[in-house]
From Swiss-Prot:
Skewed-composition ranges (Acidic residues): 23-35, 103-114
Modification type Phosphoserine: residues: S699, S701, S705, S719, S723, S728, S1288, S1290
Coiled-coil intervals: 572-600
Composition skew (Basic and acidic residues), residue ranges: 1-10
Function: Probable protease.
Protein name, entry field: MPN domain-containing protein CG4751
InterPro entries the record matches: JAMM/MPN+_dom (IPR000555), JAMM_MPN+_peptidase_M67A (IPR050242), MPN (IPR037518), RAMA (IPR040843)
Modified residues (Phosphothreonine): T1297
Length: 1412
């Protein structure tokens, strides 16, 4: 739109500067009016010159066609502004068109005399140029004949024989009076956007307008008809050979300076984002019927036409969907109707409930490239339509359609989608915006909507009323090709898939008054018109991919065509995929491709809000199973996308279930498909028949998630189709398909019952690398918070899915690696949950129970065993309903082993020294006892824990296990446990029944949450039990607090062994507690029978009470030995702990964040901290227990009545949740304040949007936002700041997603070694922590390999619900929960450790929190 070189350089090649350099497509007035008019409220039709249609005609004439076209292209004339305030549509009068680039008419918009011009030539002036007047002998060439007087200055020029003007002052040659006038006016008043030059330029002292009007009158008189441009044109054409002006397309860098006069009709080359190493800021999909209507409209006349694009904008997926086109039926003959036409369009858009998302116009006979004027006008529209805020931002695009460009090798129109990148903020007055070629996908409609038919009919009726305005479709277009045949070739690819092509085509022929076809013969090949040989070549390419259609239409019968095309497409797709992958890799190295998370967090055109709005819970489509996806770079959907799906639904429309794997159109699918790629991504400008580019991954500016970056981080939550990788907590809560991060099959997950989905989700989450998880879970979200949140809203959506997620996330942090290795995976409660979910399929009792029974202590046994055993366990888990005898034998075996260990000092020392043992100890809190059992030497039989051994059927295994465990634990205090078990068994049975009703998947899912809970409880109970029975445990727990890691480890080991024994003995009790937990957990489940009771009582009600009793009894049994504590006391402790946590949270969060950064470290740290440490109080609760288990473990530790502790826990949990909610609410408020959504109009926002910002400014902003949001761990120590920081990433989300906080309990630093896994760079804090004596002797750092996970401290529920951990844990373990480090964004998690590490002493602080 800006001065496009429509005119091109002077034929002579003289240095003619086309003056329309800044043509905004409007005269000064126009542009301004337009801006004002376009108001966001109604879809304001972009101010597009309606007469643009007229311009096309000029183009046809050739002399100024190029220029004219340019003018028309974008310029909205300052035509009558929409009278309706509602119609923000700036009305572009035909004057714009008049101003065809060449045509002085365009300039008519002249500042002062625009109206006069209109009156004079009534729109016909559009075709009048100096050449025209000279040909009619109205003007004669001569020296010094042309003058301009402006603000007291006079400029003189020569009228050359070719109709150009040579300036005396600058010796520059101007193609049109307008160009010269603008140039001269700009010299005097640079800020003035001068309009048409015809009213300013004088010939022999008389304004050119007067000459033009005189000429037009004479023509009209001769015709004895009202001035009719078409007629004038026709007459002139017959008299004068058509002057074909060859348009030259200039690179944008050739017109970099606005201060040099450029022809506004100069064509500027638009380049794809890939050419500049960037990602397209948003995806574009166009409905085939909308494209068909626009293309048809442009074919009706050889003059420029224009229209508006209506559609929708999905912030979540950054997808602009163009669903309807609204032709502007206005020509130079009825300019006065322009405003009315636009208001009608506006009303139609409102009625259709569509947004104005752009405009289209035609370049009838020249290239589909924007003119400078088009560029300016388009940029204007983009600015006007960006909305008041990021939330209201809507992109605006321009389609340029070239129907009759004679150098087009095919018969299909060239359709290009243009979007302007604004110049740098500080150079806006100096530079033109840069036109970028946007890739778009064409979504085939099943049928042609009725309104499209009516629009086609109206367009034909409108243009046919003006003589010589409409193309005669029976005539020959080129060689032997008629206009009708050309139209058929271009429209056919856009025909609806389900409708009869013949019927539709014959209807169009009837409308155009052409011969109808008896047998519809689809254009089988793309006809290539060879201009040189004038022969029509036929390409064999069956698929016609025209830029313009972007549709993948295969000419042969559609079905066959598709199948035929598919093979080729697949091959080409594969190649393209490989190439694109190679390119991507190359670019990654060259450009340092940021991860989606990072990109999302960056301000970019994509995400007009630099602030993360939503943090994906899972990577868009973590199709890759690798546990660790180091960078969340826009994941390419591996296979799913590549399936060639017929162009079906754009990614946007893809059913949510499929979201992860966006269905790509056959073509694109063949290509590398990104989750955000739309079905058919065709390069908008692909002129060649079958040429298509690999779609640019439209990530919001990168990654602004493809899921633009932080993948999906900042998409809006309300998008119709959840963006592939984005999961909102709410989604998770309701297990919406989009949410389920089932890594293996998003689609499947979507279809799976929420519960089932969740389970895999946990697994997937765990499997996913921390990075992946990080991408998925906003680190800001603490699991405790999640849990609290859920508890608060348990009624709304069971905490299960969220808890599961939280737990999974937390655990994943720890178990991701473990997940990788089955053994480690099993250890994690989350993993356990996942396993449980899977084991469900095997009818395996809740692994939770298993985990509980086996509780990390069992891990102490041979870790090597655990692996094989684990695998077997999983299998055995399926057969978890083994006879109780089996479990008993296991117990016996376990006890024997424990005895041996006890009695054999060598073995003991060995065990104590073994890293596995340390890890096992750390993991003792893990829910999955199977792994634990395996490590204990139980073998892989889950049944033992599940209670298969207990003699309980798998379903009842837990219950049974409880009972049998109780029996075995009778030795340790089985009577209460047994009683509880009995009570529980009923509940448990109920739960089981419920689970059956719910279906194992949902049950498992719940169990997952439960797992978190269970793990939490189990940890506490196990710890309590372990620590309580043997004094050494107490000592050990105390020692764990103690600095000497060895002693602690030994104590812990002893503890562990004792615990194991106790567990074995109490396995019953623990089993009971496991059952309890499960039941209890179930209580949490929204679906759970007990849930109601639970929600009603924040304490466990009914079954809960029993459960709590059981649990407490179990705890009491195990940990009852420790001094007794009252519920109140525990509560107080808990609250204290909570407060401490909250206060310390900052550090904690920082540490955790750091840990999180090191993907694996988080879990390990948590586990570390959670390592069973003898409570200082003497209660042995793992550090984890301290936090999470603090209530349960504490109760055990403090010797509180276990029942009370349990029920307390529930109550505490709920209360905590509530508190947390409060905090969160406040936090969110804070967040908003701190990281509010930027004002869209603010420079920073614009910069973020890549609009109007200097690169440096943009860069700075990006850096700031990145550092604030992503890279740097919060520096402030205050919890609020920590929270704020984490919140910065995404205000609401952050809290919604569980954060993997490495809230490891007190001093357990032993696990830290594992944290320092070789793979990851650990932050100073991590190192500091690892350096601290650990509770466990684990000498071997986990390398981050999943295998090492078994050594890794199990993520402790405390970590998961660290905030929930009753303060008692603090007291009990003598450790204070570490502060949780919260990251502003997922990116933080995945990001390399911050340059500045928190002081090492921070780690110490954390470790020593217990002493605070």
């Amino acid at each position: 739109m800006e001065n496009g070189v429509e005119h091109g350089v002077d034929e002579s090649g003289e240095n003619q500067v086309l003056s329309s350099s800044d043509g905004e497509g409007d005269c000064d007035g126009d542009g301004e009016v337009e801006g004002e008019v376009l108001q966001p409220p109604p879809p304001p039709p972009l101010q597009i010159t309606n007469d643009c249609v007229g311009e096309g005609v000029q183009a046809e004439e050739g002399e100024r066609a190029p220029a004219t076209t340019g003018a028309v292209d974008v310029t909205p004339d300052p035509g009558p502004p929409p009278t309706d305030g509602a119609a923000p549509v700036a009305i572009l009068e035909d004057n714009m068109c008049d101003k065809d680039v060449d045509s002085d008419a365009g300039d008519e918009d002249n500042d002062d005399e625009t109206k006069e011009n209109y009156e004079g030539f009534n729109g016909t002036g559009r075709t009048v140029t100096l050449q025209t007047l000279m040909a009619a002998n109205v003007l004669q060439p001569g020296l010094g004949l042309m003058t301009i007087e402006y603000l007291g200055q006079k400029f003189v020029g020569d009228l050359l024989a070719d109709g150009k003007i040579k300036s005396h002052e600058t010796e520059t040659i101007f193609l049109t009076p307008s160009a010269w006038a603008m140039h001269c006016k700009r010299i005097i008043n640079p800020d003035k956007k001068s309009g048409c030059g015809w009213a300013s330029v004088k010939y022999k002292g008389k304004k050119l307008d007067a000459y033009k009007n005189t000429y037009l009158r004479k023509c009209a008189l001769q015709k004895e008809t009202p001035l009719d441009d078409c007629e004038l044109d026709a007459e002139r054409k017959t008299d004068t050979p058509e002057i074909v002006v060859k348009r030259t397309v200039f690179a944008h860098n050739t017109v970099s300076n606005r201060n040099v006069v450029h022809d506004a009709n100069m064509l500027i080359e638009s380049v794809p984002f890939t050419s500049v190493g960037k990602l397209q800021p948003f995806l574009i999909t166009v409905n085939s019927s909308a494209l068909l209507l626009a293309d048809f409209h442009c074919h009706l006349t050889v003059r420029e036409v224009c229209g508006y694009l209506g559609g929708t904008w999905d912030m979540n997926t950054h997808t602009l969907s163009i669903t309807k086109t609204y032709p502007c039926r206005s020509t130079r003959f009825d300019r006065q109707r322009a405003g009315e036409v636009e208001r009608d369009i506006q009303k139609m858009m409102i009625q259709d409930q569509l947004l104005l998302v752009g405009w289209y116009h035609s370049h009838p006979k020249f290239q589909a490239e924007p003119t400078l004027r088009d560029c300016d006008a388009q940029l204007d529209y983009q600015i006007k339509m960006r909305g008041a805020s990021d939330l209201t931002y809507t992109p605006c695009v321009s389609l340029i359609i070239s129907p009759y460009y004679d150098e087009n090798p095919t018969l299909e129109s060239v359709v290009k989608c243009i979007w302007i990148v604004p110049p740098n903020e500080n150079r806006q007055s100096m530079e033109y915006g840069r036109p970028m070629l946007m890739q778009y996908s064409v979504l085939p409609d099943k049928e042609i909507p009725e309104e499209v038919r009516s629009e086609i009919q109206l367009c034909v009726d409108y243009y046919s009323q003006y003589r010589s305005e409409m193309v005669k479709f029976r005539n020959i277009y080129n060689n032997d090709v008629t206009y009708n045949e050309k139209l058929k070739n271009t429209l056919y690819p856009k025909f609806p898939s389900k409708q009869s092509d013949k019927a539709l085509w014959n209807w169009i022929c009837a409308v155009l008054d052409c011969e109808q076809e008896d047998d519809f013969i689809p254009p089988k090949t793309i006809k290539i018109i060879d201009n040189d040989d004038l022969e029509v070549k036929e390409e064999d390419k069956p698929v016609v991919l025209m830029d313009l259609s972007g549709d993948v239409k295969i000419n042969p019968p559609k079905e066959e065509q598709f199948s035929e095309a598919m093979g080729g497409l697949e091959d080409s797709g594969r190649k393209a995929e490989e190439e694109s992958n190679a390119q991507a890799e190359q670019k990654a190295s060259e450009l340092k491709v940021m991860s989606l998370q990072e990109q999302l967090c960056m301000p970019s055109g994509l995400n007009m809000n630099p602030v993360r709005m939503l943090s994906p819970l899972a990577t868009p489509n973590p199709t890759s199973l690798p546990p660790v996806l180091p960078n969340l770079g826009a994941p390419v959907l591996p296979a799913t996308p590549s399936q060639l799906l017929p162009p079906q639904v754009p990614a946007v429309t893809a059913p949510p279930a499929i979201t992860p794997a966006v269905t790509t159109s056959a073509l694109t699918s063949a290509l590398n498909a990104s989750p955000r790629d739309s079905p058919i991504t065709i390069q908008s400008n692909s002129a060649s028949p079958a040429k298509f580019e690999v779609p640019v991954r439209a990530s919001p500016s990168p990654a602004k998630s493809d899921t633009s970056s932080h993948a999906s981080t900042s998409r809006t939550r309300n998008s119709p189709a959840p963006s592939p990788g984005k999961f909102s907590v709410s989604d998770i809560a309701r297990n919406s398909p989009s949410i389920t991060p089932n890594k293996y099959e998003a689609a499947a997950a979507a279809l799976v019952p929420p519960a089932a989905a969740c389970l895999p989700t946990a697994n997937d989450l765990m499997a996913a690398s921390l990075a992946q998880l990080a991408g998925q879970l906003p680190p800001n979200f603490l699991q405790g918070d999640l849990a609290a949140l859920f508890q608060q809203q348990r009624k709304d959506y069971g905490s299960s899915s969220l808890n599961q997620l939280a737990a999974a996330a937390a655990k994943v942090g720890g178990s991701k690696q473990s997940n990788a290795s089955a053994s480690s995976g099993l250890n994690d409660p989350n993993v356990a949950a996942a396993v449980a979910a899977y084991s469900n399929s095997f009818n395996m009792p809740l692994p939770t129970g298993v985990g509980i029974g086996g509780s990390g202590n069992s891990n102490a046994h041979s870790s090597s065993k655990s692996k094989s055993e684990r695998s077997s366990k999983s299998s055995s888990s399926s057969s978890s309903s083994n006879s109780s005898s089996t479990s008993n034998s296991y117990k016996t075996k376990l006890m024997k082993e424990l005895d041996e260990l006890k009695n054999d000092p060598l073995k003991m020392s060995e065990l104590i020294r073994s890293p596995e043992y340390a890890a096992l100890l750390l993991q003792q809190a893990e829910a999955l006892g199977a792994t634990t059992l395996g490590t204990l030497g139980f073998g892989s039989d889950y049944s033992y824990l599940t209670g298969a051994g207990l003699g309980v059927p798998a379903a009842n295994a837990l219950t049974g296990g409880q009972s049998s465990n109780s029996s075995s634990s009778k030795s340790s205090k089985s009577s209460p446990a047994a009683a509880a078990a009995a009570a529980l068994s009923a509940d448990y049975n109920n739960l089981i029944q419920a689970s059956k009703l719910l279906g194992y998947d949902s049950y498992m899912q719940q169990s997952k949450q439960s797992n978190d809970l269970n793990a939490f409880l189990q940890q506490q109970m196990a710890v309590a039990a372990a620590s309580i029975p043997p004094p050494p445990q107490t000592a050990s727990s105390g020692s764990s607090n103690s600095s000497s890691s060895k002693k602690q480890q030994q104590l812990q080991q002893q503890q562990h062994q004792q615990q194991q024994q106790q567990q074995q003995q109490q396995a019953a009790a623990q089993a009971d507690y496991t059952a309890l937990l499960q039941t209890y957990t179930k209580l949490f489940d929204p679906n759970n029978q007990f849930a109601a009771a639970m929600s009603s009582n924040k304490h466990m009600a009914g079954a809960h009470n029993e459960l709590s009793a059981l649990l407490s009894s179990g705890v009491g049994v195990g940990g009852g030995a420790s001094g007794g504590g009252s519920k109140q006391k525990q509560k107080d402790i808990q609250s204290d702990m909570l407060n401490q946590l909250l206060q310390l949270e900052k550090q904690d969060s920082e540490i955790k964040a750091l840990l999180y950064r090191q993907n694996k470290a988080a879990a390990d740290l948590d586990a570390l901290f959670a390592t069973p440490s003898g409570a200082v109080v003497g209660a042995g609760s793992s550090a984890n227990a301290m936090k999470s288990g603090s209530s349960a473990g504490n109760s055990g530790v403090s010797g509180m009545s276990s029942p009370s502790s349990l029920s307390n826990q529930a109550a505490y949990y709920n209360a905590l949740a509530q508190e947390k909610m409060q905090d969160y609410a406040a936090f969110f408020q804070q967040q908003h304040g701190k990281y509010g959504i930027p004002d869209p109009l603010s420079k920073t926002t614009l910069a973020a949007n890549n609009m109007f910002m200097t690169p440096s400014a943009l860069f700075k902003i990006q850096q700031e936002s990145l550092s604030a949001m992503m890279m740097k761990p919060p520096k402030s120590t205050t919890p609020s700041s920590a929270r704020t920081r984490e919140s910065s990433a995404s205000p609401a989300l952050e809290r919604l997603t569980p954060t993997k906080s490495a809230s490891s309990g007190g001093s357990g630093g032993g696990g830290s070694n594992s944290n320092s896994g070789g793979k990851y760079n650990f932050s100073a804090v991590d190192l500091a922590i690892s350096s601290v004596p650990s509770n466990t002797p684990s000498p071997a750092p986990s390398d981050g390999s999943s295998g090492s996970s078994h050594r890794r401290p199990s993520p402790d529920i405390g970590r998961l619900y660290g905030e929930l951990a009753p303060p008692g844990a603090l007291l009990g373990s003598g450790g204070v929960p570490k502060k949780r480090m919260e990251f502003a964004s997922v990116a933080d998690l995945a990001a390399p450790p911050p340059a500045k590490m928190p002081k090492n002493n921070m780690g110490d602080d954390i470790l020593n929190l217990s002493h605070d």
